[in-house]
Regions:
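N-terminal small-domain helix-loop-helix segment of the aminotransferase-like
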Residues: 2-94
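Hydrophobic/aromatic ligand-binding patch that stacks against planar heteroaromatic rings
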Residues: 124-125, 186, 212
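Helix C-cap/helix->beta junction micro-motif
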Residues: 24-27, 128, 189-190
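Active-site phosphate-binding strand-loop segment of PLP-dependent enzymes
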Residues: 141-207
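Active-site PLP attachment segment
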Residues: 215-234
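PLP-dependent aminotransferase-like
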Residues: 105-166, 176
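Hydrophobic residues in well-ordered beta-strands that form the structural core
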Residues: 113, 134, 194-196, 222-224
Length: 234
């Protein structure tokens, strides 16, 4: 009764490692965890207080999310990216992972995934029946695809639609993309859609974190959330 593509999916590697480490801790073992992106810091008091204040809310929400919240996010992103956003450009969901999955389900085309990358991009493509392509990265280019490798891939079939996933700062390398300008030229040339996963964008300390959006805004969908920078996963 369950589709083969679901039955044949592996458990998320990060969640699997986390469960294994929990069992080892139950057995009295000391475990140093490198495989799970759970913040060790407390959720900021302001976030906790606002959640408490609104715990009584039970009405069905607007489809795109609370108007006031969308307006606040639009204002924040406008300052961050030096580009005017309005609330109509913002969609709220139960988590960025779920919103990414909806994008996979909605997109009619092929997915380009840098390797190495976050473990859930590929399974989401499989469930959505989207063909995916791995694009190799190296330490020489900060673990991001080069413009040349991207063009080589998409130029083989110019009539197809492609969705490129870019995650900066990157999971698992922690590196920041340095070649947005070069990538954007290929993105605009072939009209590639970009999913810019910016879940770690507020966790950069040495420099301002740039976005591919600043170079190719018309082609870019930005994804972010609360789970990393304020430790509010779930």
């Amino acid at each position: 009764m369950i589709k083969d593509k679901i039955k044949n999916l592996d458990l998320s590697a990060t969640l699997k490692i986390n469960e294994l480490s929990k069992n080892l801790e139950k057995d009295g073992k000391e475990v140093i965890k490198f495989g799970f992106g759970q913040s060790p810091f407390h959720v900021p008091d302001t976030i906790v207080d606002e959640l408490k204040k609104n715990a009584f809310q039970k009405s069905y929400l607007p489809i795109q999310g609370l108007d006031k919240l969308r307006e606040s996010i639009a204002s924040y992103e406008s300052k961050k990216k030096n580009k005017k956003f309005n609330s109509e450009q913002i969609i709220i969901g139960p988590g960025s992972k779920e919103l990414m999955f909806l994008l996979h389900m909605s997109f009619s085309g092929e997915i380009i995934i840098p390797t190495p990358s976050w473990v859930s991009y590929k399974p989401q493509s499989l469930i959505a029946d989207n063909k995916y392509h791995w694009i190799n990265t190296t330490a020489d280019n900060n673990w991001y695809p080069t413009a040349e490798s991207l063009e080589e891939l998409v130029s083989k079939d110019k009539d197809k639609s492609f969705l490129l996933i870019l995650n900066s700062p990157n999971n698992p390398s922690g590196q920041i993309c340095k070649n947005f300008k070069e990538l954007s030229e290929v993105i605009k040339k072939y009209n590639i859609i970009v999913l810019s996963d910016e879940i770690y964008s507020d966790l950069t300390f040495d420099e301002k974190n740039e976005s591919i959006f600043n170079h190719s805004p018309s082609n870019t969908i930005v994804s972010s959330g609360l789970s990393k920078w304020c430790g509010a996963g779930g």
